[in-house]
Regions:
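General marker for long, soluble alpha-helical cores
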Residues: 1-140
Length: 140
């Protein structure tokens, strides 16, 4: 399951942050943990662990899918984890599939994404995802 490279990343993140990760990792689905540690660099993982509360990070890594982890840039993932209300993110995931969310996030600039998450308005976020995903499916 965990290969040596993943184990080394876990150890390095623990060393740099002073956080013990086994309790965090045991609360997150294994597929999500593996995706996060395979797709993200140590520096990105360290920043996430250092800048987001453990409870929010656990919730975020539990609901953010492996597809989202692998197809959204690390910078934008950090923005979602740091500035997003995970309950709102979870509601959006219930309404839209990962594909629509990935398309929308990838089309937004980092500043637009940060602003949208800070506003934390479910209806506005839904409209943005719908418009960007719909425009993408029409080839716009």
């Amino acid at each position: 399951m965990f290969d040596l490279q993943l184990l080394n990343k876990v150890n390095e993140v623990e060393k740099q942050t002073g956080q013990s990760l086994p309790s965090l990792l045991s609360k997150v689905p294994l597929g999500n943990v593996l995706a996060a540690f395979k797709e993200l660099q140590v520096a990105d993982l360290v920043e996430m662990v250092s800048s987001v509360s453990i409870s929010k990070l656990t919730h975020g890594l539990t609901i953010i899918t492996p597809d989202e982890i692998s197809q959204i840039s690390p910078e934008k993932l950090k923005i979602v984890l740091k500035h997003g209300n995970m309950l709102t993110v979870e509601r959006l995931q219930s309404k839209f599939g990962s594909r629509s969310i990935i398309l929308a996030i990838n089309k937004l600039s980092e500043n637009e994404l940060r602003s949208l998450l800070a506003e934390d308005n479910f209806d506005v976020m839904s409209d943005v995802i719908e418009n960007l995903a719909f425009a993408s499916s029409r080839g716009i």
